[in-house]
Amino acid sequence: MDDLFAGSSDAPERARLEAQWLTITRHTLPALAKTKGWPVCADHCFMRILLDAVYGERWDGFVRGRPAYKHVDRERLAAAVALGERVAAGEADLWALNAQSLAWRGG
C-alpha cells in the first residue's frame, strides 16, 4: 500500500498520476463510450474495469481505503492509467476487459 507520499519527493508524481486517472476515467472514457457503444459509460465502471485488470482479479480485495485511486500503489495506478490510455486509443478491448472484470465478480 502507498502511504500517499505525504511529504515525499514522489508527491508531485503521485498528484500527476491521480490527475491523469481522474481525467481518463471521469472524462475521456465516458465521452468515448457514447460514440463507441461500449457496455459501460459511468466513471466508476471504468475505474472498476481498469483496476481489476491491473490486479488480475477484484481490486477491492487489495485496496483498503477509499477512494481507491488514493490508496493504490503508484506502480499499479500508473499501469491503470496506461491501460486506460490504451483503451481510449483503441489498443485495448474494453468489452473483453469488462467481461473479465465481471467474471471475477461472479457476473
What is each model feature region?
Residues 1-107:
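Positively charged, phosphate-engaging catalytic surfaces used for nucleic-acid and nucleotide handling
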